Amino acid sequence: MFPLSLLALLHLYIGWRVAPQLPGLATPLLFVAMLALSFALIPAAFLGRRASNRRVADRWTWAGMLTLGLFSMLLVSTLLRDLVLLLAWPFALPPLAAPTALAVPLVAGLATLYGLAGARRTARVRHVDIRVAGLPAALHGFTIAQ
């Protein structure tokens, strides 16, 4: 129960700090709807494996894990935004609330796409030869793959 409560509080924090500063009426509503969907999908990443159909389980897990990555980036972006606003406050800089609120979902979305692309690419293979002194003759030429 604690993890879901913490997840709910963090979603509420993001919504409370970002949504009111978004322009128009549709943008904040869309952002809050996305947060509600995120709150529903993240547990699906962990509960998806309980599905009897493997394809269904994979879909729920994919959706949940992708949403978890986006949520993580949203949280970090929101915290960084709050830090920027806090540091800018004493200097009476031009209003930063609206532009930084727009930057939060944009940065989070781009970072999530970058992370997804990096996770889906084929890993490079590196061949490294390491000489080990005192190695028994039976192990000469032995290959370790990691």
PLM region spans:
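Non-catalytic terminal accessory segments
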Residues: 1-123
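Membrane-embedded segments
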Residues: 120-126, 131-146
